[in-house]
Amino acid sequence: GINPNRMEWNGMERNGMDIDYRRYKALANLYIGLVHYPIMNKHKEVITTAITNYDIHDIARASITYDVSKYFVIHNIPAQRELAATIMEHWKSGFGSTYNPDRKDAFTGVELVNSIAVAVRTIEELEGVKPIVATTDARTYDNTISYARMREHLENETRPVLVLFGTGYGMTKETMESFDYILEPIYGHGEYNHLSVRSAVSIILDRLRGEAWWNK
């Protein structure tokens, strides 16, 4: 259960019902990153994937919903980062900022960087400590960690966590092996196990930072 001595309570109410025991601020900050290089294609070749408009928008919206401290869009090609910056500026300060102010808010936590290393270094500069780095995969590894254990860390410890999501056919094996943990696969009720990255991000954020509905 939740240890009230280790939590910072938000004191929120919904529909007149006190839900403090389910809606709280975890001690450890959570960061996420969308990786576009080094990525594998279906032939196991190392490639760079393109940034998509949907990935920027939808993951930014999920991030602010689940109180993610920063969402890194990680791309090694300057032209792609410039394209993403142009899209974001439309919603942050252009016509989109007045047409849809909610979208402007969603982009406040998005940062474009050229490598995973820069994302890690940025967090270390902000937090004063190197983050725990985790990623996701449809397979299990020796360093696979459950969502329950990672959520427990976020709720009870202070060291920040960076969860990286791959595009294409996933990050290279060498890159995956350099991380601290790999979150367990997302298992649905059926046999199919090929979610879009946007779906995976939303599911995982809800598991790590969502309302503890099982305590109702």
Each language-model region and where it sits:
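Terminal alpha-helical anchor/extension segments at protein ends
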Residues: 19-21
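Conserved acidic residues
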Residues: 69, 131, 160-161, 180
